[in-house]
Amino acid sequence: MNQTTYNIIIATDSFKGSMTSYEAGDAIATAIKEQTPSRVTVYPVADGGEGTTEALSFGRAAVLPQCITVTGPLGEKVQAKYTIFGTGEEKTAILEMAQAAGLTLVPVSQRNPLKTTTYGVGEMILDAVRKGCKKLIVGIGGSATNDVGIGMLQALGASFTDINDQEVSDGAEGIENIAAMDTTGILKKLKDVDIKVICDVNNPLVGDEGCSTVFAPQKGADLQMVQRMEQAITRFADLFAKEYDRWLAGAGAAGGLGYAFAYFLHAELVHGIDLVLQEIHLEEAVRTADLVITGEGRMDAQTLMGKTPAGVARLAKKYAVPVIAYAGCFGDGIEQCTESGLFDRVYAVTEQEGAFDPQMAVRDLGQKVRETMSEWIHMIDTKKGANE
């Protein structure tokens, strides 16, 4: 056993289908502690997708899971879960819009973004605010909608009426008929509430890269529907939000929900990994580390595009701390990771793509750590020697 004590920070994403972020980190930590008396700290992390709630609520006081009945994407009632933690001014709710308006809630045969609504998302927000939350963190991935958040805003108290002074219908088709709007009641309800929206796409509201053109076909729209929604949303922006930037990066996320959050609710659109790292105060720990270990189930070219390992590695490199990554497997473009300069070493547990057997995942990851540990310990010692 190596008797040198190292300060090691472990911050891996989940290995999807096999291990949560904490389980993966704990498997690595256990293997390390068998070989060296190092100080090893595990931080669950995520990039806005699976495991984000776990990462943000880990180690927090008064974590309270919530389950409420809200309006689903087709107007039906669905059960939506979210989490509250903290107290007082720090009382925070973590919500995922997909719980109320996610694509998985809509049968394939009924997917039609002209009809689907974000009304339930607004109901979730109201519930959290009524329970005293002063901070909201909202993930907006996996939506079934393209209504520019009109449904959410209606649930929060806004009114969107047609030429007959009647409330418009649900979904993107309702946008076509909006003649007037009144949003005065919304900000009163959300007074002193800070909202951060996890948004990991940079698409604008309209245009060739906008929400209708790029994402609506994935939600059941045909070409005619796409053109119809693009025209309606452009008209809406012209009439009611002309001074606001429809080209804002992220405005087109979740069928324009990013636009509604930014413009009407004054929310901040943030990248998932950046928010998580900030909220868990990882930078403070990384500053004095001898080594940072990160990873995810599959590392490939997409890893560098806002994924957890890249975010963690960039933070470590800010303080010239060595970084190694363990992946369940490698995918196309892994050489972009190895040549990026972010990672000092990258290891794959298996050459086979796809999820591990969950029962074998912890064992196999731990074994890979044991097999490679001498290599990266030598790297740390060499770096320390060079700095002395």
Predicted regions: what they are:
Residues 2-140, 144-388:
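N-terminal loops that bind phosphate or other acidic moieties
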